[in-house]
Curated annotation (Swiss-Prot):
Molecular-function GO terms, alphabetical: DNA binding; tyrosine-based site-specific recombinase activity
Annotated protein name in UniProt: Tyrosine recombinase XerC
Domain Core-binding (CB), first and last residues per copy: 1-85
Organism: Pseudomonas savastanoi pv. phaseolicola (strain 1448A / Race 6) (Pseudomonas syringae pv. phaseolicola (strain 1448A / Race 6))
Subcellular location: Cytoplasm
Subunit text: Forms a cyclic heterotetrameric complex composed of two molecules of XerC and two molecules of XerD.
Gene: xerC
Gene Ontology cellular-component terms listed: cytoplasm
GO BP of this protein: cell division; chromosome segregation; DNA transposition
Length: 299
């Protein structure tokens, strides 16, 4: 059974070209299912049926696994069995028709426009790291990039004259995004400094030694910027979430936001409509003469 799992992971890496983060998550989830099969003395993937999987997910939920994590695991199982069926190893999918336990949907954390301005307009010291970090912050918020898209960005994907960036997203899908004027200015300052490091490849964002920045370095730098400017933790996806929320709030164009984010399914984008409603509810509560004020007595 383990050799089939190894072969599937190799297929995901070489054929599907999934990101290392996604591959690690799939392997972790499927390894849990494999351990369950071995404990239940199932010797083949054909021996796993919907009742086994239902029992397994219920136990995982009781042990504190969130509904979101279980949904991801079931998605991994479906993809795995699709592969097994195509290879002639199995003739069924035990996850077909199985849904994870429903849980409370967590809304993504965002910065409001004032806090975003406070972060980006905090002032930049005249040194290599400060200008690089400012360009990273501006580009993440300007174009709503994923962290993997930012770290994989090369010089030939940037067109500062026309204000465009081409990124390679999930599933090796490319999309072209606008780059705002503030981000362009920050990049125009950063790129000459980058050239002084004698870069080892065409990466847009490099270290002082000219090496491409990895995800962990960017996460650490953004966390430091958040604590310094806002007194709170900041992670790259928070700027992507803020980009989406602010754009939807201003434009009300869900399809356009979906295209900019690179979401295959508009249901993924719809979570930002909940954030927009929260904003509208706040405006209503503060502006409507008949809105119930906090602490006001019931009529």
């Amino acid at each position: 059974m383990e050799q089939h799992l190894d072969a599937y992971c190799m297929h995901l890496r070489s054929e599907r070209q999934v990101s290392p983060h996604t591959l690690e998550a799939y392997r972790r989830d499927l390894s849990k299912v494999l351990a369950y099969c071995q404990k239940a003395q199932r010797s083949s993937w054909n021996d796993l049926d919907i009742q086994h999987l239902r029992s397994f997910t219920a136990r995982q939920h009781q042990q504190g696994q969130s509904s979101r994590s279980l949904a991801r695991m079931l998605s991994a199982v479906r993809g795995f069995y699709k592969y097994l069926n195509r290879e002639g190893i199995c003739q069924h999918d035990p996850a077909n028709g199985l849904s994870p336990p429903k849980g409370e949907r967590r809304l993504p954390k965002t910065l409001d426009t004032d806090r975003t301005a406070q972060l980006l307009d905090g002032g930049v010291e005249d040194d290599f790291l400060a200008h690089r970090d400012q360009a990273i912050l501006e580009l993440l918020y300007s174009s709503g990039l994923r962290l993997s898209e930012l770290t994989g960005l090369n010089l030939d994907q940037l067109d500062l004259r026309d204000g465009l960036v081409q990124v390679l997203g999930k599933g090796s899908k490319t999309r072209v995004l606008p780059v705002g004027s503030k981000a362009r200015q920050a990049l125009e300052i950063w790129l000459p400094l980058r050239a002084l490091t004698n870069p080892q490849d065409d990466a847009v964002f490099v270290s002082q030694q000219g090496k491409r920045l990895g995800p962990r370095t960017i996460q650490v730098r953004l966390k430091a910027a958040g604590e310094r400017e806002l007194g709170q933790n900041l992670h790259p996806h928070m700027l992507r979430h803020s980009f989406a929320s602010h754009l939807l709030e201003s434009s009300q164009d869900l399809r356009a936001v979906q295209e900019l984010l690179g979401h295959a399914d508009i249901k993924t984008t719809q979570i930002y409509t909940h954030l927009d409603f929260q904003h509208l509810a706040t405006v209503y509560d503060s502006a409507h003469p008949r809105a119930k004020r906090k602490g006001a007595a019931d009529d």
